[in-house]
Amino acid sequence: MTLSVRERIVRAVLQRVTAAVAPVPVIRPPTVPVSREAGVAVLLTLDGDSIDAHSNAVVDRSLRIRLTAVAQGSEAFDQVDNALVLAHAALMQSPNLDGLSLGIREFEADWDTDDLDAGSLALPARYEIRYRTLSADLTQMG
């Protein structure tokens, strides 16, 4: 089975972020919730995929992803900040994901942490990844 360009991009992002933040787990939902005992984790979620332009048989697309670092405890601020710093550096090291995309840019970051509950923090950062496919075949780059 041939994977879509979008899925190949998501897997490349997952691989880069996982290598950068190891041994912190990177989780792509749907999956089981992060346990309180896990300490820190990074969640990779897809916020959307939109069509930006059509040109003959080529479609320009924008995939929006969210990386959310979550942690519990007294070191939570340092842990989530460090996880996102490492993940960001890994993504920006090769913004075209070794030829899979046209580029990646930070779309939004919420450096004001969200309180999940007492002692828990979530720090999200969003990225936009531009890429091209053929209009008739989502598995082929345009």
Q: Which sequence ranges carry the predicted segments?
A:
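Charged, amphipathic alpha-helical segments and their flanking helix caps
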Residues: 1-34, 47-142
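Charged, often glycine-rich, active-site loop that binds/positions anionic groups
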Residues: 37-47
